[in-house]
């Protein structure tokens, strides 16, 4: 009973000192602490420590850490003798789950060690990425020559190729739920990101091709993905990956952004409507032009008629003026004649 209480207290001390609470590392740390305490116990016997000294030393060491379990405050003295240090005990007899207090952990120590190794493998790329600059990333393909990794010999979008993974990485499938408990910065493996790389290769070249062809953009015609895949200017880096099969044109069209141009059917309908509107406008313009011409001709005819009438009236007026003048002269002549006759008769009467 004393041995069980001491073991439970020591295991609780190791559990509190573990860096990760209730994680897979707790079991390994607790096992390591038990082994260290057993090795320390072997050295106490040859030096001849009494039970009081062993009790004082152990209590003093536990007091320095400040992690003494409240179970040691019982009336029963767990350090009454040092005979328990020489006994060989089998840890398989004890229920580690009950001692550690981990009820939700159902895996065995071997599974925990395997999960811990996988977690360390996940942390290794993160440490390398933070220590190095972003452009100088580690090449995951070990058999490629260094000449292909130079920036002056790589195609503009070679970084979007899906990288072939090693069999070890593909075979190992770590528990993502366990890795997420250790920290939020854990990223997914390269195998899970492989479809994303393929999608990027399918989408980006089409955009680059559209930007590199100003003549097509000027004329309003965009090169189709089929013609781009069949063009001789296709990057050799994308051809050099035989393990990757290119997606179908339907997948390319579905993943690419929608084109800003209208379908040909809508273009034809719009052209017909525009042609009809233009014809109606031209007909209306012709009608307006004809009406204006007719109006001008009518006004010209009316003006000519008025001018002719005016000239005729002017001629009549001149004739009437001449006749009036002649009549006025005749009247004056007659007046003068009558006056002379009157004078002549008056002279005849006077004598």
Curated annotation (Swiss-Prot):
Domain annotation bZIP: ranges: 278-341
InterPro entries: bZIP, bZIP_sf
GO biological process, one term: response to toxic substance
Gene expressing this chain: ATF4
Region annotation Disordered: where it falls in the sequence: 210-268
Chain positions with N6-acetyllysine modification: 311
GO molecular function, one term: identical protein binding
Membrane-spanning residues: none
Protein name, UniProt field: Cyclic AMP-dependent transcription factor ATF-4
């Amino acid at each position: 009973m004393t041995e069980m209480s001491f073991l439970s207290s020591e295991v609780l001390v190791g559990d509190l000192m573990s860096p990760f609470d209730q994680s897979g590392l707790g079991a390994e740390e607790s096992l390591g602490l038990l082994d260290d305490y057993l090795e320390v116990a072997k050295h106490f016997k040859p030096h001849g420590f009494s039970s009081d000294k062993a009790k004082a030393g152990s209590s003093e060491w536990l007091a320095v850490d400040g992690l003494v379990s409240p179970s040691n405050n019982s009336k029963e003295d767990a350090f009454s003798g040092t005979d328990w240090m020489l006994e060989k005990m089998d840890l398989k007899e004890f229920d580690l789950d009950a001692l550690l207090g981990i009820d939700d952990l159902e895996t065995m120590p071997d599974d925990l060690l395997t999960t811990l190794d996988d977690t360390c493998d996940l942390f290794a790329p993160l440490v390398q990425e933070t220590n190095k600059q972003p452009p100088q990333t580690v090449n995951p393909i070990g058999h490629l020559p260094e000449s292909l990794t130079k920036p002056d010999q790589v195609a503009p979008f070679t970084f979007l190729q899906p990288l072939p993974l090693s069999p070890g990485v593909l075979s190992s499938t770590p528990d993502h739920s366990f890795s997420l408990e250790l920290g939020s910065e854990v990223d997914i493996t390269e195998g899970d990101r492989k479809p994303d790389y393929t999608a990027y290769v399918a989408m980006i070249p089409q955009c680059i091709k559209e930007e590199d062809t100003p003549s097509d953009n000027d004329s309003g015609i965009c090169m189709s993905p089929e013609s781009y895949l069949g063009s001789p200017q296709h990057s050799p880096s994308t051809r050099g990956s035989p393990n990757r099969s290119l997606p179908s044109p339907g997948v390319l069209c579905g993943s690419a952004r929608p084109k800003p141009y209208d379908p040909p059917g809508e273009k034809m309908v719009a052209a017909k409507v525009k042609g009809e509107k233009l014809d109606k406008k031209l007909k209306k313009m012709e009608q307006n032009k004809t009406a204006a011409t007719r109006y001008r001709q009518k006004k010209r005819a009316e003006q000519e008629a008025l001018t002719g009438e005016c000239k005729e009236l002017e001629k009549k007026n001149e004739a009437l003026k001449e006749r009036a003048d002649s009549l006025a002269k005749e009247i004056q002549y007659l007046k003068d004649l009558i006056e002379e006759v009157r004078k002549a008769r008056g002279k005849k009467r006077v004598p």
